[in-house]
Amino acid sequence: MSAAMLLAPGDVIKRSSEELKQRQIQINLTDWTEGETNKESKAERKEGDKAEELKDGEGRNRRAARRKRAAKETKDARCDRRIHTAVGSGSSAKGPGERANENVDRGDGKVGGGGGDADAGVGTTGANGGRWVVLTEEIRRAIESKYGTKIDVYRDEVPAQIIEVERSLQKELGISREGVAEQTERLRDLRRKEKSGAHAKAAERGRRKQGKKPHGDAQREGPEEEKTSEEPASVGITIEGVMSQKKLLSMIGGVERKMAPIGARESAVMLVSNSIKDVVRATAYFTAPTGDPHWKEVAAKLQKRRTIRYTSTGGDVKTEFLHLIDHL
């Protein structure tokens, strides 16, 4: 497919505009929000005009009532001067439209939180100075691809310092379900061996192979050897759960690689649009739940023309839309 035109709902295109520009893809967006805003503004103006008219009417009525009362009072004063000789004509009555001013201080104070990162402050090597390892080949590949840092897979060696990639970081690295299950199985095996003391014995054998105990001292240090072999497996194996990218990078070193976006010359899509005028030229269209009021009509015309349709699977619509563009 070459020089493809993809139609999609306006709000989907608008949300993806930055990524589309990075891919050098043209955008033809019929903005429906301006029309809606104008309608709302007109409605608000009409309501405001009505309110003003009502207010003016009430004001005129109040003034007429005051004049009527003043005229009546003047007439009464003239009719009975003996009673009203010292009476003033001022009125202290408040008009029906007057209200007491309310000065409400809400005091919306903001409480600052000490959102420190609990993952910070971990060195590039473990507690015993050894290098960190991971439990599966898939995790190793993902880390190397994303951060450019080489890391080994655990091969039952003792001692060892193991990174357990937890759920949030699994998503960040794009680990598959199979990869997650493989890590879980290996962790279970490690804990089972830890209970049996197998790793503690292996660690002791490793120390003896390195020549830390001369053969001549074997009989003399026999009881001490037995004592050492009963040490818990935690002496030989360290497992560190990692949830954040920041902590992982502090342990293994490296920085995140920024992937270059797919450009227009690499993608078949040259233009995206939500305009009904582009229906005749559309190669395909992507449809999803939308707030674009015109999209229903556009989609109906595309369907009549039997244009190739791609439908959202219910996940993140923007991600699905960009994935489709990159793979058309």
From Swiss-Prot:
The reaction(s) this protein catalyses: ATP + H2O = ADP + phosphate + H(+)
Residue segments, region Disordered: 31-128, 180-237
Location of this chain's protein in the cell: Virion
Keyword Metal-binding carried by entry: no
Disulfide bonding pattern of the chain: none
Alphabetized UniProt keyword annotations: ATP-binding, Capsid protein, Hydrolase, Inner capsid protein, Nucleotide-binding, Virion
GO molecular function: ATP binding; hydrolase activity; structural molecule activity
Compositional bias (Gly residues): 110-128
Domain of life: Viruses
Keyword Hydrolase: yes
Residue ranges, compositional bias (Basic and acidic residues): 36-61, 71-83, 96-109, 180-205, 214-230
List of residues binding ATP: K110
Gene Ontology cellular component annotations, sorted alphabetically: viral inner capsid
E.C. numbers: 3.6.4.13
InterPro entries: Orbi_VP6
Matches recorded under Pfam families: Orbi_VP6
Membership in a protein family: Belongs to the orbivirus VP6 family.
Subunit structure: Homohexamer.
Role summary: ATP dependent RNA helicase essential for RNA packaging and viral transcription. Possesses ss- and dsRNA-binding capacity.
Protein name: Helicase VP6-A
Designated gene of the protein: Segment-9
